A protein has these predicted regions:
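Conserved small/polar residues in nucleotide/adenosyl-binding loops
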Residues: 203-209
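Non-heme Fe(II) oxygenase catalytic core, chiefly the N-lobe of the double-stranded beta-helix
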Residues: 3-9, 18-180, 193-201
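Short catalytic-loop micro-motif centered on adjacent basic/acidic residues
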Residues: 13-15
Length: 213
């Protein structure tokens, strides 16, 4: 069911992956390292390896194995916190890039970009179709506090020109509400956006994951 939903409509949600105690332990580490006050931290797991065992608990490992038994690698990890007094709107887009440790010319890889910390590239469609992203919710995520909005089945259409698509907004829009400790799993080619947080702080960790990188 879960894997079928992910493949067919582009996303699925699973509740209660983390217990209250596990969330408290994660938040304790975030507070001790003064991460909780930051709006976003890229390469989160690389910079904070001690939290990896808390994130990849038994239940999450089982979920990943069900989706892709060969999956062994997380290629990105981003921590986000959107408090009501300082948050932002994310316009409709697809996640088209991955991070690499260094540049190596590969057929159909394009839009290379070098930063101090990483090499960013847009891979071919085949690889993007085999990646799935896990959004871990440390707070309850509702329509009022920035829940992700997605266009069902849009991941099946490859790379989409969003400037043209926005004129018609063809497709079924769904708001992905997730409980505290739950996860949203999605395909990176799925069109998605989020609005400003209206109520309490909204905290989540994003893990694009693939068996191929």
């Amino acid at each position: 069911m879960m894997k079928t939903e992910l493949e067919n409509i582009g996303f699925t949600t699973v509740e209660s992956i983390y217990s209250e105690r596990e969330i408290e332990e994660i938040l304790k580490i975030l507070n001790e390292k003064e991460i909780s006050g930051q709006f976003g931290v890229r390469e989160f797991l690389f910079k904070n390896p001690e939290i990896r065992s808390k994130i990849f608990n038994k239940r999450l490992k089982e979920i990943v194995k069900q989706i892709s038994p060969k999956c062994t690698n997380s290629i990105k990890s981003i921590y986000f916190d959107k408090p009501p007094n300082s948050n932002w709107t994310v316009n409709w887009h697809q996640d088209l890039t991955i991070n690499l440790s260094n540049r190596k010319e590969v057929d159909q890889y394009k839009n290379w970009r070098e930063t101090k910390e990483r090499t960013v590239v847009q891979p071919n469609r085949e690889l993007l179709e085999n990646i799935f992203t896990i959004r871990i919710h440390l707070d309850k995520c509702t329509k009022q506090n920035g829940a992700l909005r997605v266009i069902e089945e849009s991941h099946l259409k490859g790379t989409i020109d969003t400037t043209e698509w926005i004129k018609t907004k063809v497709g079924k829009e769904t708001i992905c509400e997730v409980g505290k400790g739950g996860i949203l799993i999605m395909k990176p080619l799925l069109l998605h956006s989020s609005r400003r947080t209206e109520t309490v702080s909204y905290t989540h960790l994003t893990l694009p994951t693939t068996p191929y990188v």
